[in-house]
């Protein structure tokens, strides 16, 4: 029969607690970096051309919305919070009309121009979101 004797249990427990905190900090940082990557991509998608108010969409500028004032693009933000045992990065716009631009709306005379959902699809599909998360996590664990 073999036995393992730990004589410095308090030091071992302190070390594990410190490592646990390091993992939590790395997870928070990594989820935030992934959220910021999504925010950047969504802002890029929401910026396909510019024109003055009332001129309408500029043909040939791409599938996304044209920028008149930049309010939609500026309103896209990332918020990182901790809840229910996990970190959550919420990425999205704050202006009222953003949902109508993304999904369309029968009461809105404009055309739908998805910018947020395609941004997530692109970053997940090409592996960027995973790479950003993994690199950020590894950076904080050093």
Protein language model regions, located:
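Short, Lys/Arg-rich flexible segments
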Residues: 1-142
């Amino acid at each position: 029969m073999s036995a393992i004797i730990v004589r410095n249990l308090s030091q071992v427990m302190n070390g594990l607690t410190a490592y646990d905190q390091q993992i939590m900090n790395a997870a928070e940082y990594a989820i935030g970096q992934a959220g910021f990557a999504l925010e950047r991509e969504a802002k890029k998608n929401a910026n396909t051309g510019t024109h003055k108010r009332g001129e309408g969409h500029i043909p040939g500028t791409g599938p996304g919305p044209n920028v008149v004032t930049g309010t939609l693009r500026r309103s896209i933000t990332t918020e990182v919070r901790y809840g229910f045992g996990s970190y959550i990065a919420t990425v999205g716009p704050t202006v009222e009309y953003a949902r109508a631009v993304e999904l369309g709306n029968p009461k809105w005379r404009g055309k739908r121009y998805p910018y947020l959902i395609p941004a997530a699809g692109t970053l997940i599909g090409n592996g960027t979101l995973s790479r950003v998360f993994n690199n950020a996590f590894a950076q904080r664990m050093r």
